[in-house]
């Protein structure tokens, strides 16, 4: 209960996923902006996946982790007393960089996009509709998330959805 934000991670071992990818770059940037040298002031143990990070959280009551949603919510359901200290989006926004964290994008091959502009436009419109649907129909969306194996339980998906920043 001594952690209140990223600035409190100095001196701790922190478990995280996403080494050599966007999660690592975001974590390092936020830590550095909060006056923490990620190579000297704490130890980041990079886990192969969120399941590995969860095992450390279960073993050590003092463990800290930086986890993506919806896995953070799923972990809280499995580890008594586990809580979210700070949302990375909030930590990023507090830095007032004028930018947002982007962790996912839609990509298409240039030749396909140029040959199929109507299909691309239709996809983007339907994608936007699905985002609105998900935000407005959390319970139904959570049931689909469970059905398609994205998250094991609809209840966890529903609880995590508001924090997923879709």
Label each region the model flagged.
Residues 10-12, 105, 164-165:
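Flexible glycine/proline-enriched surface loops and loop-helix/loop-strand junctions
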Residues 1, 24-30, 101-110:
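Periplasmic solute-binding protein
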Residues 2-7, 35-38, 111-120:
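Short helix-loop capping/hinge motifs at secondary-structure junctions, enriched
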Residues 1, 19-21, 88-92, 149:
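Short glycine-enriched loops at secondary-structure junctions
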Residues 5-78:
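Bilobed "Venus flytrap"/periplasmic-binding protein-like clamshell domains
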């Amino acid at each position: 209960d001594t952690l209140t934000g990223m600035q409190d991670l100095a001196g701790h071992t922190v478990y995280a996923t996403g080494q050599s990818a966007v999660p690592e770059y975001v974590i390092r940037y936020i830590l550095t902006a909060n006056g923490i040298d990620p190579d000297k002031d704490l130890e980041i143990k990079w886990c192969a996946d969120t399941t590995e990070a969860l095992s450390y959280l279960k073993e050590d009551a003092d463990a800290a982790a930086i986890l993506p949603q919806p896995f953070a919510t799923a972990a809280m359901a499995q580890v008594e007393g586990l809580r979210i200290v700070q949302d990375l989006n909030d930590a990023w926004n507090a830095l007032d960089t004028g930018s947002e964290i982007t962790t996912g994008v839609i990509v298409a091959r240039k030749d396909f996009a140029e040959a199929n502009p109507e299909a691309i436009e239709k996809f983007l419109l339907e994608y936007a509709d699905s985002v609105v649907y998900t935000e407005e129909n959390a319970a139904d969306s959570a049931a689909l998330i469970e059905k398609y194996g994205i998250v094991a339980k609809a209840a966890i998906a529903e609880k995590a959805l508001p924090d997923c920043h879709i």
